[in-house]
Amino acid sequence: MVVRSILLFVLAAVAEIGGAWLVWQGVREQRGWLWAGLGVIALGVYGFFATLQPDAHFGRVLAAYGGVFVAGSLAWGMALDGFRPDRWDVIGALGCMAGVAVIMYAPRGH
């Protein structure tokens, strides 16, 4: 269940961050409405991936995903935009990922 959940978080991050990046490229970098439109579609795919999480609680899944989004956005920026995070970015992302682990995978006794 944990492996499936992690895979779904990764897929959601690629769809959401990629979608937002495509919209950014289409509008801010003036690459055109096709890029922005593809981004909107990818953002919709992100929403679908969130519904496939094994945990049934919307608030928990989306709260935990927020941490994945933080770390994933920094990684995306490094891979595609030449962004270099400083130590505070890294510390913050690690803290977010620790929060993801607690929120999603801590034993709850039920």
Curated annotation (Swiss-Prot):
Compartmental location: Cell membrane
Top-level taxon in the UniProt lineage: Bacteria
SUPFAM superfamilies linked: Multidrug resistance efflux transporter EmrE (SSF103481)
Coiled-coil ranges from the UniProt annotation: none
A GO term from the CC aspect: plasma membrane
Swiss-Prot/TrEMBL keywords: Cell membrane, Membrane, Transmembrane, Transmembrane helix
Keyword check for Transmembrane: yes
Primary localisation category: membrane
Transmembrane segments: 6-26, 32-52, 61-81, 90-110
Bilayer topology term: Multi-pass membrane protein
InterPro entries the record matches: UPF0060
Record NCBIfam families: PRK02237.1
Family matches, as HAMAP family: UPF0060 (MF_00010)
Sequence similarity: Belongs to the UPF0060 family.
Protein name listed in UniProt: UPF0060 membrane protein Rv2639c
